[in-house]
Regions:
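Generic structural marker for isolated residues within well-ordered, non-membrane alpha-helices
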Residues: 6, 29, 56
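Active-site-adjacent beta-strand anchor residues
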Residues: 18-22, 129-130
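Gly/Ser/Thr-rich loops at beta-strand to alpha-helix junctions
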Residues: 20-29, 47-51
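Conserved nucleotide-sugar donor-interacting segment of glycosyltransferase catalytic cores
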Residues: 32
Length: 215
């Protein structure tokens, strides 16, 4: 698909910004970056955006409120076993969710978030379409209107969060130039370990592409 993008999009719009929605999200974002040769700020995977929206939904269900009243973020790989919902940082109207829900309930929310995509696919009998489309639109909106929103997206790291040469979900500022800034939040030792494990899994998938000559 990178050949099609180059011949049908970059040919006529050389400054285009690519938002990747295809799975495996992080590896497809990495493949796009390496194949197209675009600046890293113009290749964005929307996985973390979708995962964070699902996290906020499950938090709102547990709290009995509107999802728009909840702030929550998911980082790491876009996959059932690689995503990292940051329950510690989730808030409801400025209050830490950890002070409103029991540890057991928060664990349930995190577990539901991590299997949310697979559960939906099983119920639908096919892949999700509305939520990924809405998440992609949310990313594009911040770019075309230069809204500078803080959104978790799969982006190329060069030392941030202790990782390099991969695309993985982290919070970024999105504006007219695409990725305006990668935001490094302070992680706990446990969160750092989970992020490192997530990155290792993404590297393994990338390695499989290299083995077949796709990279």
């Amino acid at each position: 698909y990178t050949t099609l993008f180059r011949s049908n999009v970059l040919k006529y719009s050389p400054n285009a910004i690519l938002v990747v929605i295809s799975n495996p999200m992080d590896t497809m974002t990495y493949l796009s970056l390496k194949s197209l040769g675009l600046p890293k700020n113009r290749i964005i995977g929307m996985g973390g955006t979708l995962d964070s929206a699902r996290f906020k939904y499950f938090l709102s269900q547990a709290l009995g409120c509107n999802a728009n009243e909840v702030e929550g973020m998911v980082i790491g790989g876009h996959g059932d076993t690689t995503m990292i919902p940051l329950a510690r940082l989730a808030t409801y109207k400025g209050q830490p969710v950890s002070s409103l829900l029991s540890a057991e309930k928060l664990d349930e929310v995190v577990a539901s978030t991590m299997v949310g995509g697979a559960t939906l696919t099983k119920l639908l009998g096919t892949s999700a379409w509305y939520a990924p489309g809405a998440a992609g639109a949310y990313v594009v909106e911040s770019i075309i209107h230069n809204q500078k929103k803080l959104i978790p997206c799969s982006v190329y790291l060069e030392g941030e969060y202790g990782e390099s040469d991969l695309c993985i979900g982290v919070p970024v500022i999105l504006g007219k130039n695409g990725i305006e800034k990668i935001v490094e939040i302070e992680l706990t030792a446990d969160e750092k370990a989970k992020f490192a494990a997530s990155a290792k899994a993404v590297h393994a998938t990338n390695a499989a592409l290299k083995e077949v000559g796709a990279l």
